[in-house]
């Protein structure tokens, strides 16, 4: 059994729908432990820094604006094969392609306003968790 950590964001559209609790319940029902969590509003600098790998792509400016449009929840999830399992729970990036019962099928409004973000690799998860949380904000539980 490989216990991993992954990073997740509940995006502004899902926060606006008051879906935080429902999404967190899905994480926990899937066997994840939420080891860090906080609500915040991204500044332009934070949003551009977080999505820096997409700078220059056609969707970058719209994504940054959307991520600044309201509060978000950021969380670190811990569990077996966490990165891939979270991606399975989220569903396809484009909600039009997301399977029924996935977070994006249930809460997304569009390709950009797709309700949740999740790390795509262990390396990304480590970088993304460190972007938002200091080591003393991570609270693993036995």
From Swiss-Prot:
GO terms for molecular function: ATP binding; metal ion binding; nucleoside diphosphate kinase activity. It is found in: Cytoplasm. InterPro entries: NDK-like_dom, NDK-like_dom_sf, Nucleoside_diP_kinase, Nucleoside_diP_kinase_AS. Its cofactor is Mg(2+). Its main location: cytoplasm. The keyword Metal-binding applies. SUPFAM superfamilies: Nucleoside diphosphate kinase, NDK. The active site is at 117 (pros-phosphohistidine intermediate). One of its GO terms (cellular component) is cytoplasm. It catalyses: a 2'-deoxyribonucleoside 5'-diphosphate + ATP = a 2'-deoxyribonucleoside 5'-triphosphate + ADP; a ribonucleoside 5'-diphosphate + ATP = a ribonucleoside 5'-triphosphate + ADP. Major role in the synthesis of nucleoside triphosphates other than ATP. The ATP gamma phosphate is transferred to the NDP beta phosphate via a ping-pong mechanism, using a phosphorylated active-site intermediate. This is Nucleoside diphosphate kinase.
């Amino acid at each position: 059994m490989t216990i991993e950590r992954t990073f997740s964001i509940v995006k502004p559209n899902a926060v606006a729908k008051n879906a935080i609790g429902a999404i967190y319940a899905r994480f926990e029902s899937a066997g994840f432990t939420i080891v860090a969590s906080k609500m915040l509003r991204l500044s332009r600098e934070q949003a551009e820094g977080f999505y820096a790998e997409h700078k220059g792509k056609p969707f970058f400016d719209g994504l940054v604006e959307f991520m600044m449009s309201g509060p978000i929840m950021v969380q670190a999830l811990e569990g077996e094969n966490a990165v891939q399992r979270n991606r399975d729970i989220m569903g396809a990036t484009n909600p039009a392609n997301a399977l029924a019962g996935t977070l994006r099928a249930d809460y997304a409004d569009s390709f950009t306003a797709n309700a949740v973000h999740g790390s795509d690799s262990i390396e990304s998860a480590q970088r993304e968790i460190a972007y938002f949380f200091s080591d003393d904000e991570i609270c693993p539980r036995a």
